[in-house]
From Swiss-Prot:
Domain notes: The TPR repeat-binding motif mediates interaction with TPR repeat-containing proteins.
DNA repair keyword on record: no
Gene Ontology molecular functions: ATP binding; ATP hydrolysis activity; ATP-dependent protein folding chaperone; unfolded protein binding
Positions occupied by motif TPR repeat-binding: 593-597
Gene designation: HSP90AB3P
Protein task: Putative molecular chaperone that may promote the maturation, structural maintenance and proper regulation of specific target proteins.
Name of protein: Putative heat shock protein HSP 90-beta-3
Keywords linked to the UniProt accession: ATP-binding, Chaperone, Coiled coil, Cytoplasm, Nucleotide-binding, Stress response
Organism: Homo sapiens (Human)
GO cellular component: cytosol; extracellular exosome; perinuclear region of cytoplasm; plasma membrane; protein-containing complex
Bias-annotated ranges (Basic and acidic residues): 224-233
Coiled coil region boundaries: 414-446
UniProt subcellular location: Cytoplasm
InterPro entries: HATPase_C_sf (IPR036890), HSP90_C (IPR037196), Hsp90_fam (IPR001404), Hsp90_N (IPR020575), Ribosomal_Su5_D2-typ_SF (IPR020568)
Amino acid sequence: MPEEVHHGEEEVETFAFQAEIAQLISLIINTFYSNEEIFLQELISNASDALDKIRYESLTDPSKLDSGKELKIDIIPNPQERTLALVDTGIGMTKADLINNLRTIAKSGTKACMEALQAEKLVVITKHNDDEQYAWESSAGGSFTVHADHGEPIGRGTKVILHLKEDQTEYLEERRVKEVVKKHSQFIGYPITLYLEKEQDKEISDDEAEEEKGEKEEEDKDDEEKPKIKDVGSDEEDDSKEYGEFYKSLTSDWEDHLAVKHFSVEGQLEFRALLFSPRRAPFDLFENKKKKNNIKLYVRRVFIMDSCDELIPEYLNFIHGVVDSEDLPLNISREMLQQSKILKYVSHMKETQKSTYYITGESKEQVANSAFVERVRKQGFEVVYMTEPIDEYCVQQLKEFDGKSLVSVTKEGLELPEDEEEKKKMEESKEKFENLCKLMKEILDKKVEKVTISNRLVSSPCCIVTSTYGWTANMEQIMKAQALRDNSTMGYMMAKKHLEINPDHPIMETLRQKAEADKNDKAVKDLVVLLFETALLSSGFSLEDPQTHSNHIYHMIKLGLGTDEDEVAAEEPSDAVPDEIPPLEGDEDASRMEEVD
């Protein structure tokens, strides 16, 4: 329960931080933040978030801005009182918001609890359209106070005042504040104004008793000259000049850039990128100790890092530019990228799993129901589903991740963890089905390279796999759709298909028994061909002659229905077209005609 303290007519309520906050508050800055200047970035970022909220609300209710039309951020250092204030005209907070949000770090809209670690005392003054103006104060101890504020009205928004420690007064200097703002918050979508208090000597007449010094308050509006990240597809006439100015401000180069690439990408992650190629190669291009790239990463226009190795290959380290995203996952300090769900596979791997398994296909439903994933999923291993065409090209170059090799479950040589009993059973199956495999290879001949016992099937009788370096079924379909494909390459990349049979399936066991009884039985041959063609379809391949497969299906249906083919044989019509077409009249004369030039 809060304690109420009455000072005249003003009521002050004291609240205790939640227990975990009181214990952890002294550790947060060292644990979450690698750079102490990040506190100012956090303040500006949260001010920007508050401005976004009021702007969104004003789209449906313009009266929300009656308490202040201008959306801006002000930074006011005061060296005399050793305070740094940041004021925004955002949505503000109600009394309940102050108590609930600033009491728990996980819910903190302004992260003010963290900023307190950089200050001896923290004061938050806020005004919401639906409530009175309140003040929140804390000395980073175990409690904070909330009371109605009757001081200078702020209209709407939030004013955060940090009473800085003696060793942090550098953040009251104009140079230092500008440096931090330009580095971390250069592309915030709202104007940032820095208020400075400077002393100037003023000339006075000789008859005045003492010399006076006047103080003049000036404001330095950094936002007027700071470059903006433009939207892709803007007016091209102004692009060249603006790109040139942006490049020079980004790189401090005195020459214009050689080339520029401005693009956006939408998909699982969305981002915009603006890349520049300089006119001259940097003098340290081939030095090993230099930065691997010169790409700055922003998330929601807030600077994150300038040394993200994954953004661009090392051999393109001369490229300058910025990348801005709305949805890249960050850690709590917004200082670095956080591993996304795409990369969580390795952390879920079992101890016995030596490889990362994946399957490519046209849709999630197709690959999830594929015969190739039956055994892998039964053993409790996760399979990465890759359903984009570009994935096929990527996995051809990406051979491993985090020390784990990438293995396609649709190719030969799939190795799964086995105990001694399973190994013994597999050897027995190979010996038992050896004759059937040889017979199936003889029947299929050049259609397959070999027929083997499968260790990947559970409920399916057979499947078609490709060689380790050949194309998968999905890649084969992609290449067939290419108008400018290389037919010579397709010839040897598509040729090697392996038929794997499931020794535990009743179809294969019955087929083995029929083959041992009479390997020349026509029904055995028909069944083998039908199984092969069906396996082609279920494995994602296309049939060269669909009509032949249809005829095999119809034939099996007739056998199942007990229909005699002789009874349904169609009679030849009397006016049927003769097999041999008679020669045309005058054909002999035509053959004697000579070609005349």
